Amino acid sequence: MRIGHGFDVHAFGGEGPIIIGGVRIPYEKGLLAHSDGDVALHALTDALLGAAALGDIGKLFPDTDPAFKGADSRELLREAWRRIQAKGYALGNVDVTIIAQAPKMLPHIPQMRVFIAEDLGCHMDDVNVKATTTEKLGFTGRGEGIACEAVALLIKATK
């Protein structure tokens, strides 16, 4: 078994909506990013890549490459997952924690789980997504941006 941890953060800027966990969420602010700014899928992709010792999302999909400008993070996750499977790993489970004062994530979490399970080809029981605030402390608490942490467990695939 191998464990990976991922973290991502994006500042608010411009107009919404935002995309978190593959879900388009109405919000007056957008997220500043080279891709679609999906902090949940970026953190998850990093956790999976880390568990497989395949580097990180910035190495695979550099923000200096114009090909990834505005990229759909679900596509990036699926490509990373293909590489991880090619290395002989299967999914144990993933756990994602979104850190945001606003907007409220709870109504969107079921669809996030559906999208992540689809992208990883796994059962929804293998995907957990939750959200928390920082009780108005720090940059997320002041409403300056959104952060996310993710943990992934990989197991050697059986043939």
From Swiss-Prot:
SUPFAM superfamilies xref list: IpsF-like (SSF69765)
Site (Transition state stabilizer): 34, 133
Residues the entry annotates as binding 4-CDP-2-C-methyl-D-erythritol 2-phosphate: 8-10, 34-35, 56-58, 61-65, 100-106, 132-135, 139, 142
Pathway where it operates: Isoprenoid biosynthesis; isopentenyl diphosphate biosynthesis via DXP pathway; isopentenyl diphosphate from 1-deoxy-D-xylulose 5-phosphate: step 4/6
Top EC class of this enzyme: lyase
EC number in record: 4.6.1.12
Needed co-factor(s): a divalent metal cation
Cofactor note: Binds 1 divalent metal cation per subunit.
Catalytic activity: 4-CDP-2-C-methyl-D-erythritol 2-phosphate = 2-C-methyl-D-erythritol 2,4-cyclic diphosphate + CMP
Binding site for a divalent metal cation: 8, 10, 42
InterPro entries, A to Z: MECDP_synthase, MECDP_synthase_CS, MECDP_synthase_sf
Keywords: Isoprene biosynthesis, Lyase, Metal-binding
Annotated GO biological process: isopentenyl diphosphate biosynthetic process, methylerythritol 4-phosphate pathway; terpenoid biosynthetic process
GO function terms (MF aspect): 2-C-methyl-D-erythritol 2,4-cyclodiphosphate synthase activity; metal ion binding
Function: Involved in the biosynthesis of isopentenyl diphosphate (IPP) and dimethylallyl diphosphate (DMAPP), two major building blocks of isoprenoid compounds. Catalyzes the conversion of 4-diphosphocytidyl-2-C-methyl-D-erythritol 2-phosphate (CDP-ME2P) to 2-C-methyl-D-erythritol 2,4-cyclodiphosphate (ME-CPP) with a corresponding release of cytidine 5-monophosphate (CMP).
NCBIfam families per the UniProt record, alphabetical: ispF
Subunit structure: Homotrimer.
Family assignment from sequence similarity: Belongs to the IspF family.
Name of the protein in question: 2-C-methyl-D-erythritol 2,4-cyclodiphosphate synthase
Biological source species: Escherichia coli O6:H1 (strain CFT073 / ATCC 700928 / UPEC)
Upper lineage: Bacteria, Pseudomonadati, Pseudomonadota, Gammaproteobacteria, Enterobacterales
